[in-house]
């Protein structure tokens, strides 16, 4: 099995087009075409992590945070990024990162936090817009089922927790073949044909547009395929930032903070004064999530759990919501479990190892 086979499963789960514009996800170093010996799963890539991969026989390191964020003008070993790259090249190790693309999928980083907190009815806090298309096409009734099956296989027809979604309308299609045509129905240069057809409608994710159209043209019986592809303004409830849900049992603020500290295995929690009453609705965002405070308040959250809050940003709570900063590393430390779950589903016998190296650069003194 080649490394690219493993990475294909990760990208099927968290497509690269879902990453933010500033991000740098995907293969960072190495040749993904080589045979895989084992994968080391980590939040960050450091020299120590590379040493561990070498010692444990892994030639693939899968990380949440990219090692390379911005362009490099030279690789001389003058900092830890360059030294890590050089070490990976010397030992033929592939470094791969799934960052904001994994943040932005429904079953990604934020779902993992929501699961640890036992949130009910968890949903994406800030769904993205303009990431969906509606595809309409017209096909003879006898071949509608086969065409739909091909479109579904290509990724069309998914709406939230439902797949193979479509709508069909019966009708009559007309056409007159030219003398140079090669019609499936009728004859070149013949009279106008009237065919019993179905108008098929399916949703297409933006990142699968090209693949779905290719499938349509390859599987449609007509020489000239009639179709319309229309961009939608609908929110895509399966892609976006953050998550919000409800606790099964509301808690007093102090009890919730104790619960949060235990479940997220964090040394401390920085927080603002809680609003009156119990904590019922919890908004959250793994990593640095201060940009989602407005959405958390709009969702009626009693608390917003995230990391990397700056001093002056805490004032933005305005006593309307409790901000609970558990730390960047702490909020995302369980992300490696997601990588393991993705790969094990397809390759249950492949060697997947969790790093033993603590890559958190922040220490706490009490």
Which residue ranges define each predicted feature?
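Hydrophobic structural segments
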Residues: 1-366
């Amino acid at each position: 099995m080649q490394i690219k086979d493993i990475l294909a499963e990760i990208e099927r789960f968290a497509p690269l087009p879902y990453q933010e514009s500033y991000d740098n996800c995907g293969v960072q170093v190495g040749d993904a075409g080589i045979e895989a010996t084992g994968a080391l799963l980590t939040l960050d890539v450091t020299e120590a992590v590379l040493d561990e991969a070498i010692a444990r026989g892994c030639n693939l390191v899968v990380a949440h945070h990219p090692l390379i964020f911005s362009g490099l003008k030279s690789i001389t070993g003058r900092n830890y990024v360059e030294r890590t790259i050089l070490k990976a090249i010397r030992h033929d190790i592939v470094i791969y990162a799934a960052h904001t693309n994994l943040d932005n999928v429904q079953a990604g980083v934020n779902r993992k936090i929501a699961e640890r907190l036992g949130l009910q009815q968890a949903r994406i806090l800030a769904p993205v817009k303009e990431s969906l298309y509606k595809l309409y096409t017209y096909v003879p009734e006898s071949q509608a089922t086969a065409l739909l099956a091909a479109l579904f296989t290509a990724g069309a027809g998914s709406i939230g927790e439902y797949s193979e979604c479509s709508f069909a309308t019966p009708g009559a299609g007309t056409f007159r073949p030219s003398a140079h045509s090669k019609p499936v129905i009728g004859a070149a240069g013949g009279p106008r044909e009237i065919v019993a057809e179905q108008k098929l409608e399916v949703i297409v994710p933006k990142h699968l547009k090209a693949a779905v159209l290719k499938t349509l043209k390859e599987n449609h019986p007509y020489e000239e395929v009639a179709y319309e592809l229309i961009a939608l303004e609908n929110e895509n409830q399966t892609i976006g930032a953050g998550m919000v849900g409800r606790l099964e049992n509301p808690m007093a603020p102090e009890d919730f903070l104790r619960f949060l500290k235990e479940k997220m295995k964090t040394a401390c929690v920085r927080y603002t004064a809680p609003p009156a009453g119990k904590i019922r609705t919890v908004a959250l965002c793994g990593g640095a999530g201060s940009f989602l405070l407005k959405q958390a308040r709009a969702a009626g959250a009693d608390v917003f759990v995230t990391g990397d809050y700056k001093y002056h940003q805490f004032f933005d709570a305005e006593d309307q919501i409790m901000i609970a900063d558990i730390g960047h590393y702490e909020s995302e430390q369980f992300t490696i479990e997601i990588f393991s779950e993705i790969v094990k589903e397809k390759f249950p016998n492949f060697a997947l190892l969790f790093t033993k190296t603590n890559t958190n650069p922040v220490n706490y003194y009490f």
